[in-house]
Amino acid sequence: MLNLRVIAPNRIVWNSEVREIILSTNNGQMGILPNHAPLLTALDIGVMKIRIDERWSNMALMGGFATIDNNQITILVNEAEKSSEIDPEEAQETFQKAQANLTRAEGKRKTIEAHLAFKRAKARLEAINVTQE
């Protein structure tokens, strides 16, 4: 088993044992199983999949870092939401607004900000859509 802790600036989002996780890193998806080699990695905005026994749970992570050592996983994130905490209607509305803002963005700074908002909205939507499959 792995001991997973997800820590945001204002709260501990997750603190329990899990069987496996799949992270969105800056280099792509990464699966973590028990006895994984020690690792420090940057996390991209995306969905983390968590396997508890035979069921999976999802969490939208808004970037951060993960450390893995001796079956202890500590994830420090800017923000995180469990799929059960996300309102599907609000997530869909936010995604549509972010998509529209991205197409209208002008200038480098506005485009970067719009792209980050789009990635955050997409991660939240993916976290709940994966759950509903």
From Swiss-Prot:
Q: What UniProt keywords apply to this chain's record, in alphabetical order?
A: ATP synthesis, CF(1), Chloroplast, Hydrogen ion transport, Ion transport, Membrane, Plastid, Thylakoid, Transport
Specify the superkingdom. Answer: Eukaryota
In which broad location class does this protein mainly occur, judging by the first location in its UniProt entry?
Answer: plastid
GO molecular function terms attached to this record: ATP binding; proton-transporting ATP synthase activity, rotational mechanism
Subcellular localization, per the record?
A: Plastid, Chloroplast thylakoid membrane
Provide the topology term for how it sits in the membrane: Peripheral membrane protein
Q: Name one GO cellular component term.
A: chloroplast thylakoid membrane
**Which CDD domains does the record associate with it?**
F1-ATPase_delta (cd12152)
Keyword Transmembrane helix attached: no
Is Thylakoid given among the entry's keywords?
A: yes
Give a short account of what the protein does.
Produces ATP from ADP in the presence of a proton gradient across the membrane.
PANTHER family, sorted: ATP SYNTHASE DELTA/EPSILON CHAIN (PTHR13822), ATP SYNTHASE EPSILON CHAIN, CHLOROPLASTIC (PTHR13822:SF10)
> What does the subunit section of this Swiss-Prot or TrEMBL entry state?
F-type ATPases have 2 components, CF(1) - the catalytic core - and CF(0) - the membrane proton channel. CF(1) has five subunits: alpha(3), beta(3), gamma(1), delta(1), epsilon(1). CF(0) has three main subunits: a, b and c.
Q: Which family does it belong to?
A: Belongs to the ATPase epsilon chain family.
Protein name according to UniProt: ATP synthase epsilon chain, chloroplastic
Source species of the chain:
Psilotum nudum (Whisk fern)
